[in-house]
């Protein structure tokens, strides 16, 4: 798979064919940050407080909205307001994994109304191509008002020990990203996918890579999570680094966010030769 990871964010913001990817790289350039905060908290108050305090230092806020015990319309209006205030995107880590008809309802309806507020969502290709097609249909529908501001990340690899997201699964992830590149921004992956070759490759493709499990202090947890540092993640091809407990569970989350911002940005500057 072709990679443009050696190019500066501002170049990718200028040249990227996907409008949401352009916006993502523009925000990163303006804020000098490639940090995605995974705010795995369980109340709306905690979530909005973190989003407000950490908003200046992150590019994307990643949510697991279904773990909130008190989710309501106020949760969403609060997130949208803070997204505008601090100029960050919202990534709902829903990991869609069902038949197409079901994921369309999960994405565009139900209790969560995800398509109305989440700029980015993700999915696994375990159900086959239909899941990506179904989500893309929602975003491209004539009556959908947010088409240019929505995108999908395909879960191509995982950081948990013993993950089966390898080999043919990863290859299918790349193949479907190429087929639906108007909607697919890129991947959630623990490493660069540059060596993955499939049909449909184009010289100008520029898929964005989000890497999870980034932690400055820990190498893992008791449940099989495996961490890497901002420097190793960016050096390995990540465009954006996702950190959860390393930031929000720190004694001073704001100080932690600043440290991750600096570490991630320094690693990016090193990668592009600045």
From Swiss-Prot:
The record's Gene3D superfamilies line, in alphabetical order, gives: Aldolase class I
Task: List positions binding substrate.
Answer: 40, 62-64, 93-102, 227, 245
The Swiss-Prot or TrEMBL record annotates one GO molecular function as:
orotidine-5'-phosphate decarboxylase activity
One GO term describing the cellular component: cytosol
What's in the keyword line of the UniProt record? Decarboxylase, Lyase, Pyrimidine biosynthesis
> Is the keyword S-adenosyl-L-methionine assigned to this protein?
no
EC number(s) stated in the UniProt entry for this protein: 4.1.1.23
Q: Where is the active site?
A: 95
Q: List the disulfide bonds.
A: none
Pathway listed for it is: Pyrimidine metabolism; UMP biosynthesis via de novo pathway; UMP from orotate: step 2/2
Which SUPFAM superfamilies would you find in this protein's record?
A: Ribulose-phoshate binding barrel
Top-level EC class as recorded in UniProt:
lyase
Reaction catalyzed = orotidine 5'-phosphate + H(+) = UMP + CO2
Give the GO terms filed under biological process for this record: 'de novo' pyrimidine nucleobase biosynthetic process; 'de novo' UMP biosynthetic process
Q: Which family does it belong to?
A: Belongs to the OMP decarboxylase family.
The record's NCBIfam families line, in alphabetical order, gives: pyrF
**Protein's name according to its UniProt entry:** Orotidine 5'-phosphate decarboxylase
Tell me what organism the protein belongs to: Coccidioides posadasii (strain RMSCC 757 / Silveira)
Q: What is the lineage of its organism?
A: Eukaryota, Fungi, Dikarya, Ascomycota, Pezizomycotina
Gene name?
URA3
């Amino acid at each position: 798979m072709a990679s443009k990871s050696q190019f500066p964010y501002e170049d990718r913001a200028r040249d990227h064919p996907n409008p949401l990817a352009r916006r993502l790289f523009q925000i990163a350039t303006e804020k000098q940050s490639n940090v995605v905060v995974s705010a795995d908290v369980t109340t709306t108050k905690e979530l909005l407080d973190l989003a407000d305090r950490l908003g200046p230092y992150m590019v994307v806020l990643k949510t697991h909205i279904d773990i909130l015990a008190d989710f309501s319309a106020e949760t969403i209006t609060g997130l949208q307001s803070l997204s505008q205030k601090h100029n960050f995107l919202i990534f709902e880590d829903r990991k869609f994994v069902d038949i197409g008809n079901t994921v369309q309802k999960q994405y565009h309806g139900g209790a969560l109304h995800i398509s109305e507020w989440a700029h980015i969502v993700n999915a696994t290709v375990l159900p086959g191509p239909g899941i990506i097609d179904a989500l893309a249909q929602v975003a491209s529908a004539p009556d959908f008002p947010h088409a240019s501001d929505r995108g999908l990340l395909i879960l191509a690899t995982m950081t948990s020990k013993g993950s089966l997201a390898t080999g043919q699964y990863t290859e299918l992830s790349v193949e479907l990203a190429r087929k639906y590149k108007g909607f697919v921004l890129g991947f959630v992956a623990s490493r660069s996918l540059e060596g993955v070759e499939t049909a449909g490759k184009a010289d100008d493709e520029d898929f964005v890579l989000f890497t999870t499990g980034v932690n400055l202090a820990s190498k893992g947890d008791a449940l099989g999570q495996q961490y890497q540092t901002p420097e190793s993640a960016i050096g390995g091809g990540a465009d954006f680094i996702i950190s959860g407990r390393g930031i929000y569970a720190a004694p001073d989350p704001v100080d932690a966010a600043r440290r991750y911002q600096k570490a991630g940005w320094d690693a990016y500057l090193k990668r592009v030769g600045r």
